[in-house]
Amino acid sequence: MSSQSKVAVITGASQGIGLGLVQAYRDAGYRVVANSRSIRPSEDPDVLAFAGDISDPAVAERLIAEAVASFGRVDTLINNAGVFTAKPFTAFTAEDWAANIGTNLAGFFFITQAAIRRFEAQGSGHVVQISTSLVDKPIRGVPAVLASLTKGGLNAATKSLAIEYAGRGIRVNAVALGIIKTPMHPPETHAGLASLHPLGRLGEIQEAIDGVLYLENAQFVTGEILHVDGGQAAGNW
């Protein structure tokens, strides 16, 4: 998957999985446009850091426009930016609703529209959503209906877009994750979180990245929700 001419746009790219994806795509020869609200400039001339709130339609449009202006094209969009809020259903607030809908759905919708317009002009492109296995297998001790609502919407949109654009050289996929060992999970929570997976451990950031890279390479795969979750979605646990 090495081609210096190709360009990937990655949201939520300042830390964790997003930061790892930036490096992985650079290692594969891609130039990268990396976005988050507070991302810092990169010393790598082939990484354009673009700060802004991806839920803002104007930011989404500018992000794709800047990618084309700087690097001449866009080949892959990874919708990695996300908010996860776990609390009892009746405890969710209007602010929780706005944050989850804004980042998880609006943050997918507007930039994906802009990217697909570009892909149509090129006759090729790939979109990947980062989702969660909680959509398929809710966990009694993890009440997170807003994650199921928003990420479930992404799963459905992934399949719908895959069919809509299959004849135009555009693939659309998603990676549904279990719990990944990122900075958002303090070390003292790891043992309890590991027990939620049949494999008995947390996923590593590299394992999430490997799922995305598999889909990037798998040219005959579209409309796929790839579970990288330690067996979580396979059955009751």
Locate the predicted segments by residue:
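Conserved glycine-rich cofactor-binding loop
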Residues: 14-15
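Substrate-binding pocket helix/loop in short-chain dehydrogenase/reductase
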Residues: 88-89, 96-101, 193
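Catalytic loop of short-chain dehydrogenase/reductase
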Residues: 128-153, 158-167
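A short, exposed helix-loop element centered on a Lys and neighboring polar residues
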Residues: 112-113, 159
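The beta1-alpha1 cofactor-binding region of Rossmann-like NAD(H)/NADP(H)-dependent oxidoreductases
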Residues: 51-63, 94, 207
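C-terminal substrate-recognition "lid" of short-chain dehydrogenase/reductases
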Residues: 170, 201-228, 233
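Active-site loop of short-chain dehydrogenase/reductase
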Residues: 5-6, 73-74, 119-132, 142, ...
